[in-house]
């Protein structure tokens, strides 16, 4: 088995811990052929597409036509998934047999919006080096590129897919000026809900003052686990970099990676998935992400809008449970995307969930009418789940005033 390791973003000297060496010793050098990647993410000129093309070129040069597995950390996860989506022939041939993602920002990271300059000042993560801006843009919550990849993945055949993330916060990496580094339901960089590849997509289209459900899709079930005591990175608690030859035999991440790579049948995959699912209830926090994208009937982004979550019998923002709200972030590059992050345990106190959308201008030659979506209890339970993301695609009616264009009979 060829195992390719893909590191994360903003890395100049990849640190895979002792996991590659330990796997080779554990599974046998004749069984495991380990390849370590080293790719550039700190240049502003490099895009995710560039990395995908370069990965494919390296694969063709080194082991063309040979099946392989991937173990990724952080941004390496979306990179491997983008490779799958881009090089469909390879995906159809089943060349990628296993994808084991550690702390993957599949739905983005709230930290990305801070900008490369501020992130570079977090010396323990980036050693005072600025991460590449275009990769950073990809990672921002609700980005066009991540949305496209996740929507496409709803219909894409996948290999044996595993997502693992820690629930620990390393105090040494906490930034007192930025609460995201200690955010509930995260590993200090990525939210569990953003790492999870079990998610929902729902489409709402406006009809007068109402938003009606016109489409919905759930992702194929995939293995997801939350590992206590592990954070995104760091030599002490990092989900990957804290693995040593001395602790690998009892290190949670090392143990699970070995088990995931050993899966060869659907029955074994279901067994591992079930055991990982049991870790979710033990997680100290349970957050949910709601990523909203607003556009008009022609597909053009609506950039000036407000989205309110509503609850209670009256579908009012004031009737939502207290302390349900954790964070709200609008994408700076794709301003028609907005992400809510809520405490799912608190949110479960309401049986009703709604969305109220108001876009501007509200009057004038071209305007928008405010619209509202009201769900039922069963819909809330099915769509908004703990430690998951729901993608909400909203299409508003673009209203044209009669005065914008008129015809009159000539005298």
What residue spans do the PLM features occupy?
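Short beta->alpha junction loops
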Residues: 36-47
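Extracellular beta-sheet/turn segments enriched in Thr/Pro/Gly and aliphatic residues
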Residues: 266-283, 356-411
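A short, amphipathic beta-strand motif
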Residues: 288-296
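Short, surface-exposed "cap/lid" segments of acyl-processing enzymes
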Residues: 1-33
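Short amphipathic beta-strand segments in non-cytosolic proteins
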Residues: 306-329
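Short Pro-Gly-centered beta-turn/loop motif in secreted/extracellular proteins
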Residues: 329-367
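Serine-dependent carboxylesterase/thioesterase catalytic core
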Residues: 3-9, 48-151, 296-303, 307, ...
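Helical cap/lid subdomain of alpha/beta-hydrolase-fold lipid enzymes
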Residues: 53, 85, 89-279
């Amino acid at each position: 088995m060829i195992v390719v390791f893909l590191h994360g973003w903003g890395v100049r000297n990849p640190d895979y811990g002792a996991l590659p060496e330990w796997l080779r010793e554990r599974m046998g050098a004749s069984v495991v052929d380990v390849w370590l990647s080293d790719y550039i993410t700190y240049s502003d000129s490099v895009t995710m597409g560039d990395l995908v093309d370069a990965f494919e070129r390296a694969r063709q040069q080194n082991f063309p036509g040979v099946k392989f597995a991937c173990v990724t950390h952080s941004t390496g996860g979306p990179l491997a998934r983008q490779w799958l989506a881009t090089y469909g022939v390879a995906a159809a041939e089943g060349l990628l047999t296993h994808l084991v993602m550690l702390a993957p920002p599949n739905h983005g990271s709230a930290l990305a919006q801070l900008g490369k300059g501020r992130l570079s000042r977090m010396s323990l993560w980036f050693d005072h080096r600025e991460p590449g801006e275009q990769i950073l843009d990809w990672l921002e919550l609700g980005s066009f590129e991540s949305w496209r990849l996740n929507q496409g993945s709803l219909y894409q055949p996948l290999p044996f897919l595993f997502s693992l993330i820690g629930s620990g916060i390393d105090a040494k990496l906490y930034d007192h000026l930025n609460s995201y580094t200690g955010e509930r339901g995260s590993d200090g960089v990525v939210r569990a809900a953003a790492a999870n590849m079990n998610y929902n997509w729902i489409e709402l289209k406006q009809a007068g003052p109402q938003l009606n459900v016109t489409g919905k899709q759930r992702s194929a079930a995939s293995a997801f686990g939350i590992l206590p005591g592990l954070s995104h990175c760091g030599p002490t608690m990092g989900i990957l970099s804290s693995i040593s030859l001395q602790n690998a035999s009892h290190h949670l991440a090392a143990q699970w990676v070995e088990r995931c790579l050993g899966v060869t049948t659907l029955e074994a995959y279901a067994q591992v998935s079930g055991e990982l699912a049991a870790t979710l209830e033990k997680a100290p926090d349970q957050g949910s992400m709601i990523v909203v994208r607003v556009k008009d009937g022609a597909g053009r982004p609506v950039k000036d809008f407000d989205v309110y979550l509503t609850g209670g019998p009256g579908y009012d923002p004031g009737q939502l449970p207290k302390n349900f709200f954790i964070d709200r972030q609008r994408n700076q590059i794709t301003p028609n995307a907005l992400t809510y992050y809520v405490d799912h345990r608190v949110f479960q106190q309401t049986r009703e969930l709604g969305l109220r959308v108001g876009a501007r201008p509200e009057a004038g030659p071209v305007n928008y009418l405010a619209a509202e979506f009201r769900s039922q209890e069963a819909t809330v339970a099915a769509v908004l789940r703990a430690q998951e993301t729901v993608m909400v695609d909203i299409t508003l009616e673009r209203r044209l005033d009669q005065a914008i264009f008129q015809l009159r009979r000539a005298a």
